[in-house]
């Protein structure tokens, strides 16, 4: 009689444990979606136009209007595409998490989610690394290659780019956590699935 009560208590406790983990993964994925979407939007809308004096002839200054856009740098374009794809991936995985039991094909759902999460980590990492390199070049220049810094002229452009990099880095860290959680979810199957 006492043994049956212990079994009921154990079954009751184990039945409740996976649910909080599911919501933790879901909430981390929502925050990662918000971070990568913010990085995408901030960088995609990043544009600054300035009129600069390039020379003076007599007393007349010669002015040139220059525009800094993310499209001018291929690394920033890749950054926007990578974070946009990560945002789409996270949105899709949120929907799979909410109604994933209906989409499970021969038990492959968890494996596919883990693989796609790892691919997304690699994609966001590449985009953030490329954009960080170009941001460093824009901030400090490269005296050996005679590339001048531009952040002293386009402060707002560089500030917005830095904010996008911070959001993308936060999204990358969250995506790494999600990837570990997805792999753990794949390796540790609930007891109801193993019987």
UniProtKB/Swiss-Prot annotation:
It is a multi-pass membrane protein. Residues 1-22, 97-109, 185-195 are cytoplasmic. It comes from Populus trichocarpa. It comes from the Eukaryota. NCBIfam families: A_tha_TIGR01569. Signal peptide: none annotated. One of its GO terms (cellular component) is plasma membrane. This is CASP-like protein 1B1. The keyword rRNA-binding does not apply. Homodimer and heterodimers. Residues 44-75, 131-163 are extracellular. Its main location: membrane. Pfam families: CASP_dom (PF04535).
């Amino acid at each position: 009689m006492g043994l049956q009560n212990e079994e009921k208590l154990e079954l009751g406790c184990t039945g409740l444990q996976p649910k909080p983990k599911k919501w933790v993964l879901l909430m981390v994925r929502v925050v990662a979606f918000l971070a990568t979407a913010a990085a995408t939007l901030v960088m995609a809308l990043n544009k600054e136009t300035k009129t600069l004096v390039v020379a003076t002839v007599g007393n007349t200054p010669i002015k040139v209007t220059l525009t800094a856009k993310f499209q001018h740098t291929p690394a920033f374009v890749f950054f926007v595409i990578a974070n946009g794809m990560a945002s789409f991936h996270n949105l899709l995985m949120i929907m799979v998490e909410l109604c994933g039991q209906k989409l499970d094909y021969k038990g492959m759902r968890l494996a596919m989610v883990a693989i796609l999460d790892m691919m997304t980590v690699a994609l966001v990492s590449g985009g953030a690394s490329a954009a960080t390199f170009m941001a460093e070049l824009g901030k400090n220049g490269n005296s050996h290659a005679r590339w001048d810094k531009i952040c002293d002229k386009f402060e707002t452009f560089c500030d917005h780019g830095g904010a996008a990099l911070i959001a993308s880095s936060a999204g990358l860290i969250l995506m790494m956590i999600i990837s570990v959680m997805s792999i753990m979810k794949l390796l540790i199957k609930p007891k109801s699935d193993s019987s």
